[in-house]
């Protein structure tokens, strides 16, 4: 498997030489560290237990770690009550650890355009019969892409999350592409949810890989979404995940199935599983049931049952677009089905991502992400 460093070197070379030309298609596992040698991993800061997440400091980028993302999904209704989903994600990838701080004016000038950090932004709008997605790439440079602290801002060109304070909220989110765009207001007063063990989120049964991970699953969203030139007033609920690590996947893991579910009893459920590259079966799972007051229940892997019940073929590949999610000890028995089964992200890093409907012991809405298929 192509190693991350060489893969990102290729991406960075194309950016340096050809500006915003799109990189060649890669899979998510290549970018997130599977297949790397231990010596390569040791060049970056490891994820370790006991490091407390602090806010607003941890809203910022963590360049000593290899990968990171700011990941928003929203389930919305337009003025006629029609459901739709919006996704915005900004990824950060590092091809090498940051260089030492500049020692003088000449060093400052040299490092302004020399960076080991690359940003990739994805944006999408999904309805029952349409799915539009687009992406942008840029090196980390103040006039192009980055993360600001006061006020908080994550941006790549004119795709921007902009807060009025150093916290994530209140904020505006703007992205525009040829076939779609959105301008949204985001507010939340709920405490952040630290996933795993106080933000230390294990990604394998043996504990070899982990990330720092927190969420805000209780966001009020309003604004405008434009699709094929028609602008709609929308409102609904959103969810942001913040995650960073130096290796998300083992070489033996091929991808994941991830669900962000908003249930009818006013709780939110995050549940995900990682799959073995040889068998395609789940090798590790995790879940947390969350309340708006900041409390939550961590659910051990042995209590989580995920079963794909319907497949959708897209461009010769099958994607599981309907699932049974069962957590008997929490009286949760759900059928999770895609609002639009054809919501594959046809980008340089392809994956499936789209809004879902929930039926069963609870009703609700949410988002699903499928990688490695």
Regions found by a protein language model. Name each.
Residues 2-6, 14-373:
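Targeting-peptide/extracellular-domain and disordered-appendage signature
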């Amino acid at each position: 498997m192509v190693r991350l460093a060489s893969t990102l070197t290729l991406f960075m070379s194309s950016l340096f030489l050809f500006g915003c030309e799109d990189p060649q298609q890669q899979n998510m596992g290549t970018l997130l560290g599977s297949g790397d040698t231990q010596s390569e991993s040791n060049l970056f800061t490891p994820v370790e237990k006991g490091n407390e997440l602090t806010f607003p400091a941890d809203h910022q980028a963590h360049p000593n770690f290899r990968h990171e993302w700011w990941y928003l999904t929203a389930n919305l209704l337009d003025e006629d009550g029609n459901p739709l989903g919006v996704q915005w994600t900004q990824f950060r990838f590092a091809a090498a650890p940051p260089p030492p701080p500049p020692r003088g004016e000449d060093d400052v000038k040299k490092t302004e355009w020399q960076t080991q950090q690359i940003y990739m932004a994805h944006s999408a709008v999904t309805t029952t019969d349409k799915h539009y997605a687009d992406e942008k790439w840029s090196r980390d440079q103040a006039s192009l892409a980055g993360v600001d602290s006061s006020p908080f801002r994550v941006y790549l060109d004119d795709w921007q999350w902009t807060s009025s304070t150093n916290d994530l909220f209140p904020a505006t989110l703007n992205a525009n592409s040829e076939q779609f765009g959105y301008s949204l207001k985001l507010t939340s007063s709920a405490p952040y949810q630290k996933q795993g063990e106080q933000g230390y989120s294990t990604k394998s049964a043996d504990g070899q890989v982990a990330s720092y991970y927190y969420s805000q699953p209780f966001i009020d969203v309003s604004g405008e979404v434009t699709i094929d030139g028609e602008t709609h007033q929308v409102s609904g609920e959103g969810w942001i995940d913040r995650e960073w690590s130096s290796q998300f996947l083992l070489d033996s893991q091929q991808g994941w199935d991830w669900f962000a579910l908003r249930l009818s009893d006013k709780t939110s459920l995050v549940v995900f599983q990682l799959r073995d590259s040889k068998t395609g079966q789940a090798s590790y799972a995790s879940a947390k049931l969350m309340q708006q007051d900041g409390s939550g229940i961590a659910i051990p892997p042995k209590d989580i049952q995920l079963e794909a019940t319907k497949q959708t073929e897209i461009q010769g590949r099958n994607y599981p677009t309907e699932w049974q999610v069962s957590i008997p000890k929490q009286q949760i028995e759900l059928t999770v089905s895609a609002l639009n089964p054809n919501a594959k992200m046809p980008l340089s890093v392809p994956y499936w991502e789209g809004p879902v409907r929930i039926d069963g012991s609870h009703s609700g809405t949410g988002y699903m992400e499928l990688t490695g298929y």
